[in-house]
Amino acid sequence: MSELKLVVAGAAGRMGRVLIQTAIETSGVTVSAALARPGSLALGQDAGLLAGCGEINVPITEDALAAIVDADGILDFTSPDLSVELAALAAQARIVHIIGTTGFSVAHLTKIEAAARHAVIVRSGNMSLGVNLLAALVKKTAAVLGPVYDIEIAEMHHRMKVDAPSGTALLLGEAAAQGRGISLSEHEQRGRDGHTGPRKDGDIGFVSLRGGTVVGDHTVIFAGPGERIELAHRAEDRRIFGRGAVQAALWGKGRKPGLYSMLDVLGLGGE
């Protein structure tokens, strides 16, 4: 069987380098191209050398259209605007697009959904096995405990993260909302300040902390009468996201076009 040829977008960034490393280390996968933004100092450098893996004869380029020629998929942890552009290219080429980018607007998501009519797109706020298992647990717990238990989601990331709440926190919030059979957008409460009054019944609260080099900490709190349940995940190594992304690309090869999540990849979509 031929190797899965993957394009790594955002190759010069922290996650881009992790994706290159992971793809190189994974049997049956090869890095066929690597992308960086126009003007990046990484342009022209060998992707393998930049990622600390040794030379792989893949120079980093800014030409996304040329990069996807003969590729089977794109690994994309970049920015909302760029992810939308790459989704359109993936749709044209009928290839797999793995999106780990966060911070999307409704308009961004609408465009990605449109692209998924012609491409296999796996989008998730977190690609790790642990977080997606946590999401399944959160959904089940929310359903069992019911609205008498208040739900709060706390997350902490490194000081350079630019969006809040994190994509993972929103993923967990959506899981909680699904467990209760409600809409997250109608019940989310992002931060509190000043005289807020009593907590509203049914709210799902979010609090975001930023500092240091924290890869990602998430805790879902179910606070009920006389007791509190906490479900948590601590990310200690970005390679967990890289492994999940490559696993998703392997899973997506040959599937029918559509918008999928990591829950689908892990066989938890029906949970």
Curated annotation (Swiss-Prot):
The UniProt record lists the keyword Kinase: no
Q: Localized where?
A: Cytoplasm
Query: Does the keyword Chloroplast feature in the UniProt annotation?
Result: no
Principal location listed in the UniProt entry: cytoplasm
Cite the InterPro entries for this sequence: DapB_C, DapB_N, DapB_N_CS, DHDPR_bac, NAD(P)-bd_dom_sf
One biological process term from GO is: diaminopimelate biosynthetic process
Q: Where does NADP(+) bind?
A: R37
Q: Where does (S)-2,3,4,5-tetrahydrodipicolinate bind?
A: H158, G167, T168
- Which cysteine residues pair off into disulfide bonds? none
Q: Which UniProt keywords apply?
A: Amino-acid biosynthesis, Cytoplasm, Diaminopimelate biosynthesis, Lysine biosynthesis, NAD, NADP, Oxidoreductase
What is this enzyme's EC? 1.17.1.8
Q: Name one GO molecular function term.
A: NADP binding
Q: Mention any Pfam family matching this sequence.
A: DapB_N
- Region of interest called Disordered, as start-end residue ranges on this chain: 183-202
Reaction(s) catalysed (UniProt annotation)? (S)-2,3,4,5-tetrahydrodipicolinate + NAD(+) + H2O = (2S,4S)-4-hydroxy-2,3,4,5-tetrahydrodipicolinate + NADH + H(+); (S)-2,3,4,5-tetrahydrodipicolinate + NADP(+) + H2O = (2S,4S)-4-hydroxy-2,3,4,5-tetrahydrodipicolinate + NADPH + H(+)
Listed Basic and acidic residues bias regions = 185-202
Q: Where does NAD(+) bind?
A: G10, A11, A12, G13, R14, M15, G100, T101, T102, S124, G125, N126, M127
Q: What does this protein do?
A: Catalyzes the conversion of 4-hydroxy-tetrahydrodipicolinate (HTPA) to tetrahydrodipicolinate.
Q: Indicate what this protein is called per its UniProt record.
A: 4-hydroxy-tetrahydrodipicolinate reductase
Record the organism: Beijerinckia indica subsp. indica (strain ATCC 9039 / DSM 1715 / NCIMB 8712)
State which gene encodes it: dapB
